[in-house]
């Protein structure tokens, strides 16, 4: 702006001086000289002066044109300079804006680099965790498989033992029915003998004594049944505690949680869907399993009690009843000799032997049996429960008369359980 003012002031000053110079040239005193003397001598001088004036005017015109050209160029240069200054100011502003943008971008880039480093560290940590979870999932799957195998073995053992107990129950129920029939026959014979030998008071007293002994033995059997019931309940609770079903359920729940976590980490939708279905049905499965275990334990307890009803019957001494010979009845001499040799309970082969065979004591799946032919394998020995040394609850299997020993087919498959099945000969 100052350069434009200078050019305007210089042009305004140049114009009046030029006009004054031209007026002075026109009002020169050389034109007013009219004397003749001077015209002759000074004509040359005048001409030379006129020539000089013309040259000066030409140079003045040239200078004016040059000055005007220079002024126009100066104006153009000043306008360009003003435009350049404006552009310079704009560029400075743009430069400042770009610098601020660059600083912001640089800060953002540093933040992104920091975030990238944090994300890379987190990625490495998550990768390590994923590797650990994969290893843990493999280990848990192996543990789950081993537990399922143990559970299958125990189920097979339990089923085989339950089958053997059912066979024992059927066998002893048949024996008891036979004994009841024989007792009924003996009661009929006793009533007949009482009618025939009503006069014999000594025989009646002996019969009453035997009946009292029999009643005492029945009471003893009831007390023994109550004791065995308590002992069986203790054995069942002890076996269930060592079976530790709740720990298996907790292990199953832990495995399901690990599988779901691993599937979420790996984004496995199919596995998550199947696992959610398993988790949704887990309560029903657990309740069904608990009910099955409870019913099996109760049935085992009932079978054990029914099979031990006639286990510890005391031998009863029989008193021979002798008939007083009747001299008037000659036809009964042959029968009297047979009646003299007949015992009161000689009709029962089991009672006449003096003792009743003991049945197999009830044991739960996995209980070590001393009557086993083979030694338990390493896989089944871990699940076996060591029984106590109480003789009344000893898990040894005794074979009653009329029962043959047969090895279950599960012994050949698994090699860790041998069950004696009863077969009536």
Curated annotation (Swiss-Prot):
Q: Which domain of life is it from?
A: Eukaryota
Sorted keywords for this record are: Coiled coil, Endoplasmic reticulum, Membrane, mRNA transport, Phosphoprotein, RNA-binding, Transport
InterPro entries for this protein: She3
Q: Name one GO cellular component term.
A: cellular bud tip
Membrane topology (UniProt):
Peripheral membrane protein
Phosphoserine occurs at which residues? 343, 394
Transport listed as a keyword: yes
**Which residues lie in Polar residues bias regions?**
35-45, 345-358, 382-397
- GO biological process entries: endoplasmic reticulum inheritance; intracellular mRNA localization; mating type switching; mRNA transport
Q: Where is this region: Disordered?
A: 24-45, 322-425
- Chain intervals with Low complexity compositional bias: 326-338
Using the record for this protein, list the coiled-coil segments as residue ranges, or answer none.
Answer: 68-197
Any one GO molecular-function label of the UniProt entry:
sequence-specific mRNA binding
Q: Where in the cell is it found?
A: Endoplasmic reticulum membrane
Any Pfam family matching the protein: SHE3
Further notes on this entry?
Answer: Present with 1010 molecules/cell in log phase SD medium.
Q: How does it assemble?
A: Interacts with SHE2 and MYO4.
Task of the protein? RNA-binding protein that binds specific mRNAs including the ASH1 mRNA, coding for a repressor of the HO endonuclease. Part of the mRNA localization machinery that restricts accumulation of certain proteins to the bud and in the daughter cell. Required for the delivery of cortical endoplasmic reticulum into the emerging bud.
Task: Tell me which family the UniProt entry assigns to this protein.
Answer: Belongs to the SHE3 family.
Output this protein's name: SWI5-dependent HO expression protein 3
Origin species: Saccharomyces cerevisiae (strain ATCC 204508 / S288c) (Baker's yeast)
Q: What is the lineage of its organism?
A: Eukaryota, Fungi, Dikarya, Ascomycota, Saccharomycotina
Gene from which the chain derives = SHE3
